[in-house]
């Protein structure tokens, strides 16, 4: 996956959200994420101070080292507590020392749950 990709997220209220992506270089080889940390935040708008969802390495995000994978999980109990319908923005950043790379960004939409 190239840097700075725009990719919209649809989060279903009350459902476990799972997304796994692989960060690759221009030749398609995975980038080794050993030593990296990650963070993902969802906000109502870019300028909002409050976060709707906030994940970090070890707390919703798991990095796959040499495989270059980034697994994002939002628990069903967390998505159930989200206001729906909702439309906001998010980004996913990888941090290696003092270098921050925005890997993904886009709209984050929460669809309402019907079954309870």
What are these regions (language model features)?
Residues 1-116:
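Contiguous segments within soluble domain cores/interaction surfaces
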């Amino acid at each position: 996956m190239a840097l700075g990709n725009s990719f919209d997220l649809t989060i279903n209220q009350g459902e476990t959200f799972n997304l796994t992506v692989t960060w690759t270089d221009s030749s398609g080889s995975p980038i080794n994420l050993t030593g990296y940390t990650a963070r993902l935040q969802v906000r109502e708008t870019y300028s909002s101070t409050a976060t709707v969802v906030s994940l970090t390495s070890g707390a919703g995000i798991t990095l796959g080292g040499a495989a270059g994978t980034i697994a994002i999980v939002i628990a069903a109990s967390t998505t159930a507590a989200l206001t729906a319908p909702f439309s906001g923005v998010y980004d996913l950043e990888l941090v290696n020392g003092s270098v921050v790379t925005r890997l993904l960004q886009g709209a984050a939409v929460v669809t309402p749950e019907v079954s309870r």
